[in-house]
Amino acid sequence: MSATAPFKTLSAKAAFQLDQELMSTGEFSIDQLMELAGLAVAKTIYKEYPPNEATTTTKNKFNPNKVLVLVGPGNNGGDGLVAARHLKLWNYDPIIYYPKRPASNQLYSRLIKQLQDLNVPELTTLTEVKHLLDSRDSKIKIIIDSIFGFSFKPPIREPFKDLINYLGQNHDHLPPIVSVDIPSGWDVDEGPGTEIDIQASCLISLTAPKPCAKLFVNSGPDKIHYLGGRFINPRIAKEYGIEDIVNKYQGDELIVKL
């Protein structure tokens, strides 16, 4: 097991305050932040699991083409929808599962319409998800976990409890799971619970890593950790003590491997 990763983290409370500051004095809209976050997720997928290229992992070689995007009801889910749109344009074949949608929310309705215009298919039941992943000839090569973000508070409720439980129990035969900001079901500050535990292969921390990211990288020797969401100005970075992490970006990078 590797040593604790030397990077600054933001608690759930601090991450919430930072987001609020970005959207008040920072004058960012939620659309902008979601677009930048989703782009970072897509770029992480492209860099770590390139399309139509064999990638060596500890288990096998695979051609990462079809991507299953698991979409939650909040902003984390919106990041996943944005990522799916980019991946479709980059020669991946995303499929989304979006079982619980915000009522009458134009932002999410627009994101769904954009995916429909790109002919991105959608699964409507957990049975379909299980059938797709359990099938011997399943073509799914990557699972994007964009169910819950840093504002998640336990317990996990349906329609996500059975889904997350399935992912945790069947980890050994599932394709790599890439979690957005936190592995869904984990406590943002304390890490995995005792009942349900998604074992992600890759984590993309947005804005700055959360405390559970250190537990993630220390949970196995082959864990992959990226930082994305390059929209923090120097004043906010200093205020929250994350100058070092923000300064890891070089040139025109929108993501950086930690």
UniProtKB/Swiss-Prot annotation:
The protein's Enzyme Commission number = 5.1.99.6
Tell me the GO molecular function terms.
Answer: metal ion binding; NAD(P)HX epimerase activity; nucleotide binding
What is the enzyme's main class? isomerase
> Residues that bind (6S)-NADPHX, according to the entry?
N75, N76, G77, G78, D79, G149, F150, S151, F152, K153, P154, P155, D181
Per the entry, what this protein does is: Catalyzes the epimerization of the S- and R-forms of NAD(P)HX, a damaged form of NAD(P)H that is a result of enzymatic or heat-dependent hydration. This is a prerequisite for the S-specific NAD(P)H-hydrate dehydratase to allow the repair of both epimers of NAD(P)HX.
Homology family:
Belongs to the NnrE/AIBP family.
CC terms in the record's Gene Ontology section = mitochondrion
Where does this protein hold K(+)?
A: N76, D145, S184
Cofactor field = K(+)
Name the species this protein comes from: Candida albicans (strain SC5314 / ATCC MYA-2876) (Yeast)
Key word DNA repair present: no
UniProt keywords (A-Z) are: Cytoplasm, Isomerase, Metal-binding, Mitochondrion, NAD, NADP, Nucleotide-binding, Potassium
Q: What is its main location?
A: cytoplasm
> At the top level of its lineage, which domain of life is listed?
Eukaryota
Q: What name appears for this protein in its UniProt entry?
A: NAD(P)H-hydrate epimerase
Q: Which reaction does it catalyse?
A: (6R)-NADHX = (6S)-NADHX; (6R)-NADPHX = (6S)-NADPHX
Residues in domain YjeF N-terminal? 15-244
Q: How is the cofactor bound?
A: Binds 1 potassium ion per subunit.
Species classification: Eukaryota, Fungi, Dikarya, Ascomycota, Saccharomycotina
Q: A Pfam family this protein belongs to?
A: YjeF_N
Question: Which compartments does it reside in?
Answer: Cytoplasm; Mitochondrion
